[in-house]
Amino acid sequence: MPTMDDSVSAALSIQGDALRFVELRRQDGDEPRLARAGTLRFPFDLGEALLREDGTSSHLRRVREALADALGDTPARTLQVAIHPPDGYSFFTPISSDVPVRDRKRQLLQQTALVTGVRSTKELHLTSETVRTTQDSEGEPFMWVHVLAVPDAVDRRMGDLVGALPPREYTWIVSSEAVSRVTARIERAGGSAEEALRPYTLVVGQYPTHTEYALSRNRDWYHAHYAEEARSPENRAYFAVGFLNRVGVPLDGVGRLFVYGVDLDVGAYAPFEQIFGQAPEVLDPVRVVGAGPEGPLDAPGAFAPCVGAAMGNYL
């Protein structure tokens, strides 16, 4: 068993048949650097096997063994687990800032039951965080709270999986929040005066099953959305505009545009450049954490959620 080290962070992300893992290390107060990264592939869909309430437990042992080979000697105390929106329940809900804490929790549980359709929220593993505070039309303060929930059976299964690793604790994070951590680090390096007047950053995640949208304002995560119907660049742009309209963000308020995910062709995002007047950039986490001892990542855009999840310890 390795000695636990608070300067080390580890994460994994689950998508299709791929389980990606990273380990970050910080030395002498410097920025975290990539220590190891890799992709484990399986002849079955990991989301179906691991992240469904009726998942295939027969595959768990195989994944445990492969993950133990990859991260079995990590000194990280906690493992961050990044999942994509369709693989859990991820939503935002407004709550009045004047509501007592106990009543806030009750409202969150009621909203979660409504969104998920479960008979009892005791069937879920639930996490929540206040993303931002704003005011309603009458000037009353309220909070936008993000909720991430997975079936309790899924959480127990993840506990069995993590049991093969040195970290005994793990936390869930949705991919759209994780990638916003990466953009925050990239933008912290500086920006132009024009970008200061356009404070929003839009990040688009491209996957075979869905498209993700993460929105940040002044480097802080602001809101998120996903669409299963957005398969073409034109449809992705259409849903992006609808998302921004829904949260009241003007199109000319977007100062930077990133894309991440799998099978990326940034040239196919010409409709976004026409709409937002910004050239899309591939969200490459190597710009933040370096290439690592084994050289550049083979698909940097695909690793953005995993690296962003691991960065949680350094925020």
Regions found by a protein language model. Name each.
Residues M1-G117, P141, I275-A279:
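Non-catalytic, solvent-exposed interaction/assembly segments
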Residues P2-T3, S7-L40, P75, S137-G253:
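Small-residue (GG/TT-enriched) beta-loop-alpha framework at ligand/catalytic clefts
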Residues T56-V63, S232-R236, D298-P305:
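Phosphate/oxyanion-binding active-site loops and adjacent basic polyanion-contact surfaces
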Residues S57, P199-V203, Y269-Q274:
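ATP/nucleotide-binding catalytic cores
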Residues P75-P86, Y170-T171, L251-D263:
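Short glycine-rich phosphate-binding loop at a beta-alpha junction
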Residues T78-E187, V288-V289:
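Active-site neighborhood for divalent-cation/phosphate handling
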Residues V179-R185, L283-L315:
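Glycine-rich phosphate-binding/hydrolytic loop that grips phosphoryl groups
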Residues V254-Q278:
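Glycine-rich phosphate-binding loops at beta-strand->alpha-helix junctions
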